[in-house]
C-alpha cells in the first residue's frame, strides 16, 4: 500500500505543512499540489466542495506526492467511508464532543474487527495499491475537531480513543458564543 507520508512524518516528530482547498476545482487542487505542501485538505464542511467535486480533486492530488485529506461535513459514517473509498488518506471530523462520538468516527474509518467500515475502495485500491485493505486501518489518519465546551471538558476521554491520531481545536466554537471573539 502507498505509505501515508504525513503519518510517517508525524511518527518521526517532523512538522507537517497542510494546505486547504475550499473551492471545487481540479485546477486549484493541481496548483496547490505543486506548491510544496505535505498534504492538502479538501473542505467538505465549510467549503463549496461536495463528493462529485472531491473525487476529481482527489484524482488530481493523487498524481503528486501530496497526501490527500478531507474534512467531512459531519460525523456521518456513510460520508466518511465513501470519501475514504475515493482515495482520501485521512479524515478531519467536525463536532466531536465526547468519547462515544470519537469512537463512532474512528470505527467508521476502520474495517472489521477494528471498526465497521464497509469494503468498497474502488479508487482506494487504484491509489493505495492492491494490499489496501490489509494496511488501510493503520495508514488512514483520523483527526477529531474539538469545537464545543463539552468537547473541551471531555478532551482527555476523547484523546483516549484507540485509533484517533490527533485533534484540531477550534477556539471560535469552544467559547459560549462565537461572538465572544468578535
What are these model-derived regions, one by one?
Residues 1-18, 130-136:
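N-terminal amphipathic alpha-helix/helix-capping segment at the start of soluble metabolic enzymes
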Residues 51-72:
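Alpha-helix-loop-beta-strand connector modules within alpha/beta enzyme cores
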Residues 93-161:
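Conserved anion-binding
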Residues 93-97, 165-172:
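Non-cysteine beta-strand/loop elements that form the S-adenosyl-L-methionine
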Residues 173-182:
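Single conserved hydrophobic/aromatic residue that forms the stacking wall/gate
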Residues 66-90:
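Active-site beta->alpha loop and helix N-cap motifs at the rims of alpha/beta catalytic domains
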Amino acid at each position: 500500500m502507498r505509505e501515508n507520508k504525513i503519518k510517517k512524518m508525524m511518527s518521526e516528530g517532523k512538522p507537517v505543512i497542510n494546505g486547504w482547498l475550499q473551492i471545487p476545482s481540479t485546477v486549484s487542487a493541481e496548483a496547490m499540489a505543486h506548491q510544496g505542501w505535505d498534504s492538502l485538505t479538501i473542505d467538505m464542511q465549510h467549503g463549496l466542495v461536495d463528493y462529485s467535486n472531491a473525487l476529481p480533486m482527489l484524482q488530481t492530488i493523487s498524481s503528486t506526492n501530496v497526501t490527500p485529506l478531507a474534512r467531512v461535513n459531519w460525523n456521518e459514517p456513510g460520508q466518511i467511508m465513501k470519501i475514504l473509498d475515493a482515495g482520501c488518506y485521512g479524515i478531519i471530523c467536525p463536532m466531536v464532543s465526547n468519547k462515544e462520538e470519537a469512537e463512532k468516527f474512528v470505527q467508521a474509518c476502520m474495517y472489521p474487527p477494528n471498526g465497521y467500515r464497509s469494503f468498497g475502495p474502488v479508487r482506494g485500491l487504484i491509489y493505495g495499491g492492491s494490499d489496501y485493505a490489509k494496511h488501510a486501518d493503520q495508514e488512514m489518519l483520523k483527526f477529531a475537531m474539538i469545537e464545543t465546551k463539552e468537547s473541551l471538558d471531555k478532551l482527555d476521554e476523547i484523546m483516549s480513543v484507540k485509533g484517533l491520531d490527533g485533534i484540531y481545536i477550534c477556539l471560535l466554537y469552544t467559547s459560549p458564543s462565537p461572538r465572544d471573539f468578535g
